[in-house]
Amino acid sequence: MVTAPAVALPNIPVALSPLVLGTMTFGDTVDRAEAARLLDMALDAGITGVDTANVYAGGATESILGELLPKRRDRVVLATKAGIAHPDQGGHAPLSRAGLRAALEGSLRRLGTDHVDLFYLHQPDHVTPPAETMAAVAELAAEGRFLALGVSNHAAWRIADLMRLADELAAPRPVIAQQLHNLLARRIEEEFTGFAAHPAAHGLRTMAYNALAGGLLTGRYQEGRAPGAGRFGTSRLASAYQDRYWHDGLFAAVARLRDVADGAGIPLAALALRWLLHRESTDAVLIGCSGAGQLRANLEAAAAGPLPDDVLGACDEVGADLRGPMPAYHR
């Protein structure tokens, strides 16, 4: 298991492991039997975090976890999310008072539990006033529906605003942010990581998702070739992932990073995971998988420790070229 420290989150009795099992593939490209095998492997390896969302596989992911987790519920930090349109909400905006309550109640029903440990606001709702969202958060927390609040895909200024509203409305502050971060997606470093480290963020933790860029950082995909089975080809989110990553500049960066990995004598996927996991700004990394081999490889990479300084420097050179020469707006 990875040597990075576990993360203590307020009100949650189980410490969050530095690797967290992402389950978005469960019920999509991974069937129930394989999901059970992957969950067993993860828990046996010391992973305590299990992450899902109400929209994953149309709710099937939560239903599968509801069948698999009951006997092990006290061993895990169970997280789900709401904030993307879902039938449970009955047409209400995702983060409205009615929409948020309906979404969480639907998740709890599928998960077969009366509460989750960690409840994320999945993405900003550009219709609902944030004060309404945080008032709903306060109500649900008071009812014991969740133990701690997280946010995902939120800019630093939005999180700061939610923290202000939390204090005004006696709601729980967000204690962790789940953000897109990998060797090809480093925008988080431009502002969010500085905010999270500042006292004004009240000790906000950071969990990175898409560590392998949906599989692009495994080197299995090639520009100009059909993706075949997997996240970019056959999953429910294939179109969204192609929009995010299927670009000439990113394929060129992958080729350069593959050379870096080859020079260091490690697989490209291991390079990507070790680079992310051992950054000072990273508290936990979400790892998804579609099979036991992938999960085993991720666990082995995480146990290998930090990358050498020269390899880190080579990775940063690729990242700098991806950013380009455009100057920052802030100082």
Q: At which residue positions do the language-model features occur?
A:
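N-terminal binding-site loop/beta-alpha segment at the start of enzyme catalytic domains
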Residues: M1-V76
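N-terminal small/glycine-rich loop or linker at the start of catalytic domains
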Residues: P10-F26, A79-H92, H115, Y120
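Short, acidic/polar
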Residues: V30-A42, L95-L111, I159-R164
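Beta/alpha (TIM)-barrel catalytic core signal, keyed to glycine-rich beta->alpha loops juxtaposed to Asp/Glu
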Residues: T128-V318, L322
